[in-house]
């Protein structure tokens, strides 16, 4: 059994509250996992992406309330970048994850975000044209299911474009529904989550969450039979994640750092990836580890690192730029679920935990594995084809 290099991985842990106010100290992550409810008062280190000035948060950094997780690169990206010069392109993701992109037609992937991005459709068109992905099958709705009467802008436009573009990158033929909640209040996001299912989506991706709270949204809104719910684990490192990723009915998607040497890709755990032993959430029957007595997260993972991040086009916020964070990972994997076409058979993150699926997931934790090829930040790894989905 491989052991987790706790001292090294502890560098990633920082509650959002500490990100805002500045962390006053550090605490190694040895010993029992910290309860998410304790995140406000415990000392933490600053996440590496913030300490190195690699990125900034696209949304307000708050604790206990829903916020988007998208990070905008501030280091290593040219202000005049275009397309693949801003970060990883769709072809990189398709190649690394061995995705058969001719599949996915008719599969509906819903994105739930807060507030309106008035240029979402045109931005998606620009992104897809740049990378030769063809015309999108895309619809935008408000939380009542109307194609109009959209909410006001809430600052989530970067997140919105990132989400719909990453689904396009990994499943160009998937149908994409963007469901915009009236605000980032939990009740509005819950309403949008329910509406996504009413509209017919069997895959729902959420690149937002509540740092330090496992109860900020109702579990019932993320537990519909025949629907695969995915959620990003956040970018504050170990033991800071909350709902919806913490919920047992949701596939918690952590983050990796993708790299390329010549024509060969590789991945390691991204230092900012959220995850941990989620005290307060009962351990699902499909989790079989003896390391965490509660719900362990993440379940799976995909590219989230900021070196170089992924390319995004968002005219509302200036055009082309690089973005990173687990906000990218959740829709990347959601698109892969669309290709697999098995969403109606999913049960939270169970598919990642099946032993027979290990060969279809890249081992991303190396010396940082808790057991076998599992780690909190990276789960059981990233897709190696569709066999694990």
Task: Give residue ranges: language-model regions.
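Bacterial N-terminal signal peptides that target proteins for export
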Residues: 1-11
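C-terminal motif of bacterial Sec signal peptides marking the signal peptidase cleavage site
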Residues: 19-22
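Phosphate/diphosphate-binding glycine-rich loops and adjacent basic-rich segments that engage nucleotide
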Residues: 263-274
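Bacterial signal peptide processing site
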Residues: 24-27
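Short acidic, Pro/Gly- and aromatic-enriched capping/linker segments at domain boundaries
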Residues: 366-374
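Substrate-binding/charge-relay-adjacent region of secreted/lumenal peptidase catalytic domains
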Residues: 31-255, 276-324, 330, 341-350, ...
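Short acidic, Gly/Pro-enriched loop/turn segments at secondary-structure junctions
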Residues: 186, 259-265
């Amino acid at each position: 059994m491989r052991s987790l290099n706790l001292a090294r991985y502890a560098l990633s842990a920082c509650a959002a509250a500490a990100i805002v106010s500045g962390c006053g100290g550090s605490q190694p992550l040895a010993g029992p996992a910290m309860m998410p409810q304790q995140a406000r008062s415990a000392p933490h280190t600053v996440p590496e992406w913030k300490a190195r000035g690699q990125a900034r948060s696209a949304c307000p950094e708050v604790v206990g309330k829903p916020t988007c997780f998208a990070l905008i690169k501030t280091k290593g990206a040219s202000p005049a970048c275009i397309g693949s010069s801003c970060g990883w392109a769709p072809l990189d993701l398709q190649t690394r994850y061995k995705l058969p992109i001719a599949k996915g037609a008719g599969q509906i992937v819903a994105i739930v975000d807060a507030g309106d991005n008035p240029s979402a459709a045109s931005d998606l068109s620009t992104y897809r044209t740049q990378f030769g992905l063809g015309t999108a099958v895309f619809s935008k709705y408000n939380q009542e299911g109307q194609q109009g009467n959209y909410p006001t802008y809430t600052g989530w436009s970067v997140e919105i474009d990132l989400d719909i573009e990453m689904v396009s990158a990994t499943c160009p033929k998937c149908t994409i529904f963007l469901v915009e909640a009236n605000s980032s209040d939990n009740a509005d996001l819950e309403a949008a989550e329910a509406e996504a299912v009413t509209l017919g989506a069997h895959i729902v991706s959420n690149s937002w969450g509540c740092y330090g709270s496992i109860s900020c949204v109702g579990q019932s809104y993320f537990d519909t039979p025949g629907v695969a719910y995915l959620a990003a684990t956040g970018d504050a490192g170990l033991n800071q994640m909350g709902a919806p990723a913490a919920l047992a009915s949701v596939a918690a998607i952590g983050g990796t750092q993708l790299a390329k040497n010549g024509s060969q890709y590789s991945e390691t755990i991204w230092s900012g990836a959220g995850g941990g032993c989620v005290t307060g959430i009962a351990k699902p029957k499909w989790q079989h580890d003896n390391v965490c007595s509660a719900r362990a997260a993440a379940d799976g993972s995909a590219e989230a690192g900021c070196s170089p991040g992924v390319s995004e086009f968002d005219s509302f916020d200036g055009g082309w730029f690089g973005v990173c964070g687990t906000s990218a990972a959740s829709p990347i994997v959601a698109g892969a679920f669309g290709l697999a076409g098995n969403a109606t058979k999913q049960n939270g993150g169970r598919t990642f935990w099946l032993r027979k699926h290990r060969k279809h997931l890249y081992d991303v934790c190396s010396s940082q594995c808790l057991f076998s090829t599992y780690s909190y930040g990276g789960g059981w790894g990233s897709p190696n084809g569709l066999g694990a989905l």
